[in-house]
């Protein structure tokens, strides 16, 4: 394998797979990814001051990796109305957040008009305190809500943008392979449907992130296939702001207790995933985010030497990783995030959702 040639050229899906399969050049792959990171984004590591608002944990979905879901009559079930969501957004804004990430479950009661009402209420209550970016509703949520409202995805996205949706999380991607999806999330949108929602979002002027969940039942070929799909979309639309690899948290996942999945990814696979992603995307998707909630502080710091250049957010309220068995907390102060970055010799800079630096 001629790794040095990979620095300059766009590598193929086949070469991407070779990198995942390789067991002899781990540190050379890491070194190449770090060199590319330095060339593309320099030594700045960005972060965002944000809050997660999950407005309900009640969901009709059947995702085998989700431990957050509750049934309507469960004692821990909750459902916030638009006014309650808006109050949480205001609290976040008052404590310095520049972004709120709003997500919920899949229910008949949640349609596009309900989502639009949330956006409207958040804007009304926060606008006198200055702008806050609303990063909300996964592709699955958008599709489900559009169907509940009798709308096309395009119509739904137009309504959401008009009511203040700034950007969307590119979650619900998991692994973009329908065979894998049929096993881990059988009722979730198909690969082609996920692509349809995000490309239409981009065409509507709504930027999205993109993600990949790994360390469950997928094989290396599925990782290469997934990254290839994301790069193709980005070349067509330019609408992805960042790529976020999501390591599978297995402890409380229903699939794990059925003995159908691995014990999550190894630390080596975590780091290799960041590195291969950087080598594959280069500056096509120039921002790669590490997740301190899923990896922990120390491995996240190491990943900053494996191609990543963003450390995510303060996450004032983060419930999903915690429910899945995450043990690294649900909030980190801005000062602690900055200290994490400084400790590895990088320069911390606050950004907004669109990756514009906040001086």
UniProtKB/Swiss-Prot annotation:
Residues 45-282 form the Radical SAM core domain. GO terms for molecular function: 4 iron, 4 sulfur cluster binding; 5-amino-6-(D-ribitylamino)uracil--L-tyrosine 4-hydroxyphenyl transferase activity; 7,8-didemethyl-8-hydroxy-5-deazariboflavin synthase activity; iron ion binding. It comes from the Archaea. It catalyses: 5-amino-6-(D-ribitylamino)uracil + L-tyrosine + S-adenosyl-L-methionine = 5-amino-5-(4-hydroxybenzyl)-6-(D-ribitylimino)-5,6-dihydrouracil + 2-iminoacetate + 5'-deoxyadenosine + L-methionine + H(+). Pathway: Cofactor biosynthesis; coenzyme F0 biosynthesis. Its cofactor is [4Fe-4S] cluster. Keywords: 4Fe-4S, Iron, Iron-sulfur, Metal-binding, S-adenosyl-L-methionine, Transferase. Binds 1 [4Fe-4S] cluster. The cluster is coordinated with 3 cysteines and an exchangeable S-adenosyl-L-methionine. [4Fe-4S] cluster binds at residues 59, 63, 66. Its EC number is 2.5.1.147. Consists of two subunits, CofG and CofH. Catalyzes the radical-mediated synthesis of 5-amino-5-(4-hydroxybenzyl)-6-(D-ribitylimino)-5,6-dihydrouracil from 5-amino-6-(D-ribitylamino)uracil and L-tyrosine. Belongs to the radical SAM superfamily. CofH family. HAMAP family: FO_synth_sub2. This is 5-amino-6-(D-ribitylamino)uracil--L-tyrosine 4-hydroxyphenyl transferase. It comes from Methanococcus maripaludis (strain C6 / ATCC BAA-1332). The lineage of its organism: Archaea, Methanobacteriati, Methanobacteriota, Methanomada group, Methanococci.
